[in-house]
């Protein structure tokens, strides 16, 4: 058999791997890159019409977003996924296609004035519909024969509703080899969904490494942390704007806010309104509610048994139309606005940032991973000014983050997952991580006795009775992004340090009036940090 690494190698988006075995060709994921590329994804080395099927680990666009393009270019095979993943993809791919069409239309309107050539969307709603029609949904833990010599099974990996690791048994020349693709490995104790499943055996493992170089630390009390942020923002008559992934993270936030309201943890603001301003998030919430309870954790099932909807509460409002979305920012009542996209690269969240970033009384709360070169990452790293819709916006709002709130396992979680294999796999391929993170995690595994490597896009391996052999090295050439001299200066590491200092000052200002005990602890921590670095 042969494997070709096509995307999300030494970067975290655009997942795609080609498996050629037993006379068949299958893609494991077919994701869209988000943010600026670090390394160019490689073209699929065979015609889309020659691919027999796609195995989707979960519904996030960085794992499924190029399926409509694959279909547009001639793919007609089946797309295999869990039932919830198939359901979620039915809304997420339509939404992605809508964004493609909208952006192309906007560029063409703008380009007409300058005489630019018209642009075509990457794919259309029709392409997305055609891809959705090819999905086949399956239950967890059920063996599925794709073709003679190829059997797969989806197991819950606790990252997102429907997310899975995929076990693949390939039989060639009378010998069976087992591959495991981890998918995105989930964090422990997330609301609603189950914890990751730990597998016992595999010959070759392909695993993600998003947080392979860091720990989430002790799990905070997210409900208490979120309640404090809401309280102090509402007390200064501001809005809490939360850029959130429409699927998974939004429902997690609703779970937390329901508990905050049930326990009256935010006082003096009545039944404060909470807006879901994302048609996709609204549809995803419906799918969560309609999903079989066997996909949920014990706590969620206990609530359901009592007749409690875990993601519903008084004051929850949804805005579907553009007019409803615009009306949110004309209402002076302090509120929570949850909107997509989670990295602020597209969607209605950009309008809410435009209306709230410049207001000192407001808070922008990040609740998920922010990839390099995204607007969300820039704000977290202390940007003073950002451009939205061609307009320069001064950043005066409080910028904060619920740290550790992640759908991805941290370093310890990843190590626990890979160490569940007994005996150790013959080789572990490290994928889906930022450039240096993949190298660091591969080195960590090597030190623990694993045979580990981090392939680059385009790398090709043969796996057979003699083991795994690299047939072709991947490309290590970085994509050069043209930036102005001023932007280049802003991207330096020292500038990041200055921005972090400015952010610290804003956080100090926002803590004015806090409890003396908390302020003293904060001051001690800052002084200890200064003592460490004052050279």
What residue spans do the PLM features occupy?
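A polyampholytic, Gly/Pro-enriched intrinsically disordered region
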Residues: 100-105, 292-305, 387, 469-492
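His/Asp/Glu-rich metal-coordinating catalytic cores
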Residues: 1-55, 60, 64, 71-252, ...
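Hard-cation-handling environments
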Residues: 229-374, 386-387, 422, 437-439, ...
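Charged, amphipathic alpha-helical linkers/stalks
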Residues: 458-518
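Short, compositionally biased "basic patch" segments
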Residues: 191-206, 293-300, 370-396
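Generic long, charged, amphipathic alpha-helical segments
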Residues: 387-418
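A general structural motif
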Residues: 185, 218-223, 312-324, 343-345, ...
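Short, surface-exposed amphipathic charged segments that create phosphate/polyanion-binding patches used
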Residues: 150-154, 287-295, 415-417, 465-475
């Amino acid at each position: 058999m042969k494997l070709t690494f096509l995307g999300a190698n030494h970067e975290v988006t655009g997942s795609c791997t080609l498996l050629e075995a037993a006379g068949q060709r299958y893609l494991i994921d077919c994701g869209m890159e988000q943010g600026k590329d670090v390394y160019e994804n490689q073209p699929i080395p065979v015609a889309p019409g020659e691919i027999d099927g796609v195995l989707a680990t979960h519904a996030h666009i960085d794992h499924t977003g190029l399926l409509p393009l694959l279909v547009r270019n001639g793919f007609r095979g089946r797309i295999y996924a869990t039932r919830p993943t198939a359901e979620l993809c039915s809304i997420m791919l339509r939404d992605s296609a809508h964004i493609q069409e909208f952006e192309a239309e906007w560029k063409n309107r703008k380009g007409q004035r300058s005489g630019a050539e018209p642009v075509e969307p990457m794919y259309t709603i029709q392409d997305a519909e055609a891809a959705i029609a090819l999905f086949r949904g399956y239950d967890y833990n059920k063996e599925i024969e794709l073709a003679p010599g190829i059997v797969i099974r989806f197991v819950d990996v606790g990252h997102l509703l429907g997310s899975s690791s995929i076990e693949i048994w390939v039989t060639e020349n009378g010998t069976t080899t087992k591959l495991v693709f981890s998918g995105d490995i989930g964090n422990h104790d997330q609301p609603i969904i189950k914890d990751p499943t730990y597998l016992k055996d595999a010959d070759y493992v392909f695993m993600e490494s998003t947080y392979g170089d860091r720990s989430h630390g002790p799990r905070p009390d997210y409900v208490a942390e979120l309640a404090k942020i809401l309280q102090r923002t509402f007390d200064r008559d501001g809005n809490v704007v939360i850029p959130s992934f429409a699927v998974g993270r939004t429902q997690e936030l609703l779970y937390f806010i329901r508990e905050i309201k049930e326990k009256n943890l935010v006082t003096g603001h009545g039944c404060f309104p909470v807006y879901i301003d994302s048609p996709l998030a609204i549809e995803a919430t419906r799918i969560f509610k309609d999903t079989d309870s066997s996909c949920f954790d014990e706590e969620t099932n206990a609530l359901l048994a009592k007749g409690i909807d875990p993601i519903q509460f008084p004051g929850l409002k949804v805005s579907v139309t553009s007019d409803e979305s615009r009306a949110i920012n004309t209402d002076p009542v302090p509120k929570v606005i949850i909107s997509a996209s989670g990295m602020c690269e597209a969607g209605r969240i950009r309008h809410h940032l435009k209306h709230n970033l410049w207001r000192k009384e407001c808070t922008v709360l990040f609740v998920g991973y922010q990839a390099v070169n995204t607007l969300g990452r820039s704000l977290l790293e202390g940007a003073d000014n950002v451009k939205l819709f061609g307009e320069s916006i001064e950043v005066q709002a409080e910028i904060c983050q619920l740290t550790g709130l992640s759908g991805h396992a941290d370093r310890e979680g990843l190590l626990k997952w890979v160490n569940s294999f007994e005996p150790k796999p013959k080789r572990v391929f490290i994928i889906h991580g930022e450039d240096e993170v993949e190298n660091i995690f591969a080195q960590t595994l090597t030190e623990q006795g694993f045979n580990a490597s981090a392939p680059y896009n385009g790398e090709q391996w043969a796996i057979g009775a003699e083991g795994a052999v690299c047939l072709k090295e991947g490309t290590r050439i970085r994509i050069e992004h043209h930036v102005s001299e001023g932007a280049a200066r802003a991207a330096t590491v020292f500038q990041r340090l200055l921005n972090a200092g400015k952010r610290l000052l804003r956080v100090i200002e926002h803590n004015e009036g806090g409890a003396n005990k908390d302020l003293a602890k904060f001051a001690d921590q800052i002084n200890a940090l200064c003592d460490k670095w004052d050279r």
